[in-house]
Amino acid sequence: MPAPRRLGWFFAHDWDGDAMRRLGAAPGGPRFDAAGFDLFAFPGNLRLLLHDHERFAAAQAARGRRLGWAGVLSHHEQLGALAAALVAEQLGLPGAAPQALLAAQHKGHARRVLQQVAPEASLAVQPVMPGPREAPPEGIRYPCFVKPVKGAFSVLAREVPDRESLAAMLRFGPLEGWLAHRLVEPFDRICRARLPQAGSAHRMLLEEPVPLRVPQHNLDGWVGEGEVRALGVVDAITYPGTRAFLRWEYPSRLPAAVQARALDVARRFLGAIGFRTGTFNLEFFFDAASDRLSVIECNPRLASQFGDLYRRVDGIDPHAMAVALALDEDPRALPRAAPVAGVAASLVYRAFDPAAVPPPPDAARRAAFARAFPDGLLLPMPKRGAALARDFRWAGDHRYGIVHLGATDRAQLAQRAAQASALLGWRFDW
């Protein structure tokens, strides 16, 4: 029997870490060599002080040569996806070109590309791009939606009604300013060398706001041999009066024709930036009243949180498909499992008041949840002190847990979500 093929998998945390362990334990399956650190948890985040994409990629490329890697991958937005592309380039392995990753992840450059290839799906952007810790210049039209040119997890992304609100948003303390700079600088350094026309990533993008009544959706897909294909669309449901996600549901309620339009936009954008292989997810709004589809961004990586939803409802494994692409194999050849649910959801528990953050479930509550929901997936995300305060400052809320559940239909899903929330001692919203 031939030896299992080995791959490098970078910054595999949470959903990706679970998938890496599951796939790596499969008999006869590939074996994974992990690398990276948790940039939001101590002590791993101390490594951010000295992190350099090129140095990290060179070290991992040397490791890959020594271990005989057949592929490399990462779905980590902030650091991993670009690092995997750099390593694949150095080792001559399958993967997206680093310039394509840069073009998609630099939100200012990506917006300009989208305006050229799919203007009907692009939000209007103001030419002014202030940086963190800068005073907002004159001439900005309010209200506007503000987000970092290079960001992740909706950090520092929100609508601001006036100049005073924007100034408060950009007013960082010394530690916050340092952290924001360090999060972006490794990316900006590569961008200056490989995509200089994009401009500085240490900036904020100002876009036209979209009414809160307009729902958000996520198209997941993959590219192989230059062909762009869809996995499906996941619907976002938000907390009332906010853009904060309450849950994600699959399958989507969007008409098939609208889903096809989203795929067409993704195809044009990915072709324009030269993204030829890998997974992607396209975040977009769709306003049924005006029939307008507006792209938020296109991420050149798997939306890892949703992989479990596809496994439950369709019996397909997006993480396994990503591994196949990293090995230059056809993901469609992978076997499908029997679906176990008609609908599935990723429930996101948030607090909007620092004084109202519930404690994480203790051992008894976790055991009760496991007994009642053997199919359930529980991910507590507790924070305290400065990390908790930073969540409220940068995101406007604190995400303290996620639960995944499946059901035969949406009515049963709501019932199961209420029961699970009660067992965990967490607030239930639907």
Residue ranges and their predicted role:
Residues R133-A135, L166-A168, R292, P354-P360, ...:
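Short, conserved charged micro-motifs
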Residues R350-R384:
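Glycine-rich active-site loop/lid that clamps phosphate-bearing ligands
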Residues R158, E207-E208, R399-A407:
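Short, well-ordered beta-strand elements within core beta-sheets of diverse protein domains
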Residues A85, E89-E159, R163, P174-R194:
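A conserved helix-loop-beta module that forms one wall/lid of the active-site cleft
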Residues R261-L282, P300-P358:
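Active-site "cap" helix and flanking loop/linker of ATP-utilizing ligase/carboxylase catalytic domains
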Residues L170-T238, R261-D264, F285-S294:
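Phosphate-binding site of ATP-dependent enzymes
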Residues A84-L86, D291-R301:
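A short beta-strand motif that forms the metal-chelation/ATP-contact edge
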Residues M1-A100, Q116, G131-P132, D328-E329, ...:
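ATP-binding N-terminal substructure of ATP-dependent carboxylate-amine bond-forming enzymes
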